C-alpha cells in the first residue's frame, strides 16, 4: 500500500464557494480525508494578468487553457473592483470543511503573498501570517495548526516568520521528503512537508494529454522514492475537472494508493526527521521562483 498526502489549495472566492463543496462530496463518497489550505482575505487573483507579458507565464496560461480551466470571474477578480473577502463570504463552507478534514492557512491575500512576500521584511511576513491565522481561527473556532505558503513562495525568511505561531507543520516548498528546517546551528524549526509531485497545470500540454493525466500521475506516485505529496486546486479539480479527480480516486485505490491528510505523514518523533533548508529555485511548468528543499548539515 502506498500512502500519499493529499493537499488541497483553495485560492479564490469561486474555488471556495463552488469547488470546495464538490470536493467535500467527492471525498466523502470515496472515504478519503485530505488537508485543505484556505485563502481567507480578499480575492485579488485577477491582478496576476499583468504577468501575461512574461513568456513563461503566458505559455502556461495557453497550455492549460486557463480561461476555461479557471473561468473569467477568477481571472478578473480584484482588477476593476476591490476583491471580495473570501472568508467572510464562505465561512459556513470553511467551517464544514474543518469539521471533517485537516484545515490550515494558505494565505490572507494569495495574490499579495505570491507577488510581494519575496521582498517583505520578517515583520511584514509575520503580520500577514497573523492576519490570516486570526481570520481562519475566527471562522473555524479552533486553533490553526498547519499552513502552506501560497504559490510555494517561501525561503528561510518565511520559515523564521512562521515560528512564533507554534504550528504542527508547514508545507511551504517542493521537495522529496519531510524534514526539519535548520534555522541556525543547533536550532531547527517547524517540520516541513514538501509537495513532491507535479500539479495538473504544470504538466498538461504537449508532454501529457488530459485524457492520460491520471495514468501518468498515478505512475509518478508509485515511483516516488520519498514521501509522496500531491496537490490539487479547488478551482480546477473541484470545478471543471471534478470528474477527472473522481476518476483519479478510483484508479488510485485500485493501484493500492491510500490518500491521507498531510498531518498523518508526520512521525511520532519529529526529531528523527533529517535536516534541511528552503532555498529559492525553479521547476518545469511553473513561472517564477518557489521554495525548494535543500539538504543541510548541523555544523
From Swiss-Prot:
Pfam families: Polysacc_deac_1. GO terms for molecular function: hydrolase activity, acting on carbon-nitrogen (but not peptide) bonds, in linear amides. Residues 2-260 form the NodB homology domain. The gene is arnD. Transmembrane segments: none annotated. GO terms for cellular component: membrane. Gene3D superfamilies: Glycoside hydrolase/deacetylase. One of its GO terms (biological process) is response to antibiotic. The keyword Lipid metabolism applies. Keywords: Antibiotic resistance, Hydrolase, Lipid A biosynthesis, Lipid biosynthesis, Lipid metabolism, Lipopolysaccharide biosynthesis. It comes from the Bacteria. The keyword Nucleotide-binding does not apply. Its EC number is 3.5.1.n3. Belongs to the polysaccharide deacetylase family. ArnD deformylase subfamily. This is Probable 4-deoxy-4-formamido-L-arabinose-phosphoundecaprenol deformylase ArnD. Pathway: Glycolipid biosynthesis; 4-amino-4-deoxy-alpha-L-arabinose undecaprenyl phosphate biosynthesis; 4-amino-4-deoxy-alpha-L-arabinose undecaprenyl phosphate from UDP-4-deoxy-4-formamido-beta-L-arabinose and undecaprenyl phosphate: step 2/2; Bacterial outer membrane biogenesis; lipopolysaccharide biosynthesis. It catalyses: 4-deoxy-4-formamido-alpha-L-arabinopyranosyl di-trans,octa-cis-undecaprenyl phosphate + H2O = 4-amino-4-deoxy-alpha-L-arabinopyranosyl di-trans,octa-cis-undecaprenyl phosphate + formate. InterPro entries: ArnD, Glyco_hydro/deAcase_b/a-brl, NODB_dom, Polysacc_deacetylase_ArnD. Catalyzes the deformylation of 4-deoxy-4-formamido-L-arabinose-phosphoundecaprenol to 4-amino-4-deoxy-L-arabinose-phosphoundecaprenol. The modified arabinose is attached to lipid A and is required for resistance to polymyxin and cationic antimicrobial peptides.
Amino acid at each position: 500500500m502506498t500512502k500519499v498526502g493529499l493537499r488541497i489549495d483553495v485560492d479564490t472566492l469561486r474555488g471556495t464557494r463552488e469547488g470546495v463543496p464538490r470536493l467535500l462530496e467527492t471525498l466523502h463518497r470515496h472515504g478519503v480525508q485530505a488537508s485543505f489550505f484556505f485563502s481567507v482575505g480578499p480575492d485579488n487573483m485577477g491582478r496576476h494578468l499583468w504577468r501575461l507579458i512574461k513568456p513563461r507565464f503566458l505559455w502556461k496560461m495557453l497550455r492549460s487553457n486557463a480561461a476555461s480551466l479557471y473561468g473569467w470571474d477568477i481571472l478578473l477578480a480584484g482588477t476593476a473592483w476591490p476583491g471580495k473577502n473570501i472568508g467572510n463570504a464562505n465561512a459556513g463552507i470553511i467551517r464544514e470543511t474543518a469539521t471533517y478534514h485537516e484545515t490550515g492557512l494558505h494565505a490572507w491575500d494569495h495574490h499579495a503573498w505570491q507577488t510581494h512576500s519575496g521582498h517583505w521584511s520578517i515583520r511584514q511576513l509575520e503580520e500577514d501570517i497573523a492576519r490570516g491565522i486570526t481570520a481562519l481561527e475566527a471562522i473555524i473556532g479552533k486553533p490553526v495548526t498547519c499552513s502552506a505558503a501560497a504559490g510555494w513562495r517561501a525561503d528561510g525568511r518565511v520559515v523564521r516568520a512562521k515560528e512564533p505561531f507554534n504550528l504542527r507543520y508547514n508545507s511551504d516548498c517542493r521537495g522529496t521528503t519531510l524534514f526539519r528546517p535548520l534555522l541556525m546551528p543547533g536550532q531547527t524549526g517547524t517540520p516541513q512537508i514538501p509537495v513532491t509531485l507535479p500539479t495538473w497545470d504544470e504538466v498538461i500540454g504537449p508532454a501529457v494529454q488530459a485524457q492520460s493525466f491520471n495514468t501518468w500521475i498515478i505512475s509518478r506516485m508509485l515511483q516516488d522514492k520519498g514521501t509522496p505529496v500531491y496537490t490539487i486546486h479547488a478551482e480546477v479539480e473541484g470545478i471543471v475537472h471534478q470528474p477527472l479527480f473522481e476518476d483519479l480516486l478510483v484508479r488510485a485505490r485500485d493501484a493500492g494508493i491510500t490518500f491521507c491528510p498531510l498531518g498523518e505523514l508526520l512521525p511520532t518523533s519529529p526529531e528523527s526527521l533529517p535536516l534541511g533548508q528552503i532555498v529559492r529555485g525553479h521547476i518545469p511548468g511553473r513561472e517564477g521562483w518557489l521554495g525548494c528543499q535543500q539538504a543541510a548539515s548541523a555544523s
